[in-house]
Amino acid sequence: MNRIIMKRVFIIACMVAVGMTLHAQTKAEQIKHIRQVYAQAKQKVDKMGQDGKAAHTVHIHQIEMGEPGGEYTPEIDTDTQFYFDRIGGDSEQGITGKAVCYFVSVNWMADGHTNYRKYLFDPVKGHLLFAFMKAETHAGFKVETRYYYDAQGNCIEQKHKVQDQEATADSHSWNDWKSELESGRKNARLFDLMLNTERPYPELASALYPSSTPKAKLLKDIRAAYAKAKQRIEQNDKDGGVKNDIEITIHDQQSEDFPPVTTLWKCYYEQIQQPSPYQRYYFISEKTESMYGESYEEYLLDPKPGSENVIFIYNQGYAEGEEMEMRYYYDENGHCFESKVSDIVESEPVPARNKAGYIFSIFDELMQ
């Protein structure tokens, strides 16, 4: 009986050992694959925009400054770069290929130090494969982390350095594999929102009835708010001023039969401290350029406390030698009470407002 038991124990132990070896081999193969994908992604990044091919990139630059006080003005300067491909398009059928992000780099400067994050995504399926971070506090505490993930989001390997020395996961509290996974997925959500949102844009809700405020007063208030916003933008853009803005630049070519398009969004916001801290947008602009033409749009938000409604939209475009110009004025209930458009275009205040809501949602996702 003892021999039988011992034999069974031996067999089970062998099976466990073999299973662990296979698991280790599988893990090693996964890490090897991730490193190969990383090397391929870096090659594509280095060649981006060369060989006569259009670039497929999104660049986000955010400057966030607190109010001056004490010995210094707190400032965070962040650059985020997305690299992507278009997959599965059919230009003859008018089908735009899906934009698939394969690499993201984030550089942010805080407390006088430049910090880095890099995210590698599967170039076909889009899930996170690898996350890297290198950061330093104002006191000189340096941390470096590497996390490797499988297709289900499980961490299969992690490496840490503290003060340039090999360390364990519990040697610092800067991040962990779950926080980096969520950060990578957040970037993926933001990317999909910017590049893969289908038209028409989601419709914004509005009140059943227009505002009871006289039209003349509404126009006066909107024009005053516009002038004030422009003054604040001028101060924001001055050298040495308190800057709070985000700039998003998209270089894209939806298919080989379409020309490259560059889109620039710029969002200006203010820091609100009461009743709880948050960032409040007050002006957003969009500029689009391609060989077919160009357009420029402005979105003014209601300056009233607690309001996030767009109250004015301006659109100017040039295409095939024709100039188009549109102005839409909205009350606090979302109704367009005044529009001024060129003769060659039809007035479409509702789609214009819906597009404004879509752009706001991008900045909402970014600022979370």
State what each model feature region is.
Residues 127-128, 155, 310, 336:
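Hydrophobic "anchor" residues
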Residues 52-116, 120, 233-295, 300:
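Surface-exposed acidic loop/strand-edge motifs in secreted or periplasmic proteins
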Residues 20-24:
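Sec/Tat signal peptide C-region and signal peptidase I cleavage site
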Residues 127, 136-138:
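Short helix-loop boundary/capping segments
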Residues 121-127, 151, 300-308:
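A short, structured loop/turn motif at beta-sheet edges
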Residues 105-109, 132-136, 159-162, 285-289, ...:
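Beta-turn initiation residues at beta-strand->coil junctions
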Residues 26-79, 138-260, 320-368:
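Long terminal segments
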Residues 5-18:
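Sec-dependent N-terminal signal peptides
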